[in-house]
Amino acid sequence: MKVNKYKVLATLVRSFFDAFSSGIIDSTVGDKADTPANRHTPKMVKQMMLDHYEHIAPVFMDTMFFPLAAMNYEYADIERVVREAQQRGDDMMALVRTACGTDAMYEGMVTEYKRNFGNLLSGRMTSNADHLEAYTRGNDAEAVLSAERAVELTVRVVMFAYARGLRQNAKGKVQLRQATLFRLMLDAMNVLLNDEAVSVDDADASDLGSLFLKVCHTQQMFTTMTDEMDRTYDELVRREGVEQ
């Protein structure tokens, strides 16, 4: 199975903003608000964006560079890309532009960044259906990525962005809130692997396996996701101050 790179790109950008903002909100409200609707009121989302406005772009670029590069280059070539950028004296923004591979992909990334940023500034978290209708589509039908790699990169963005959002208000190690992480991952897989948003309203919320299989469709995609979640969690423990 292949996924168009522009769809992957849009998923990565949306997932970053959803996860980063959720991390900030979780670190602010703790367990005082127990549902996503209560935790993501328009007023709360707007205030979060205003309080952390200057931090969003640097964290975005740091979080997104590797997934963007891995989407457009072979893993073996990424080190060369970084080395050449350092020799040119590129700043992080230029490095991210290089990671996009083409001007069209970079422009698509900027458009998605502005769209998601603007939605949050207005206090809105876009629904899966709205995202799938509005995301930036490129003209290159041949620009595709294996679904397995797309899932792996999406998992990485969700978990790193969420952890880095949690750390914005933290003084020590942070703990991932499972309910938030699973909600973020479910939404991310929904928009990545489907052309129309899959409703999970009729699914048993206590049966996570069934919920994820409904949006992932196959055991292979579900296993790819869970394996990458385990690997990324270990990396977060080592590098990002996440409690084990």
Feature roles, as predicted:
Residues 1-54, 59-61, 65-157, 162-244:
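Extended non-catalytic scaffold regions that mediate assembly and binding
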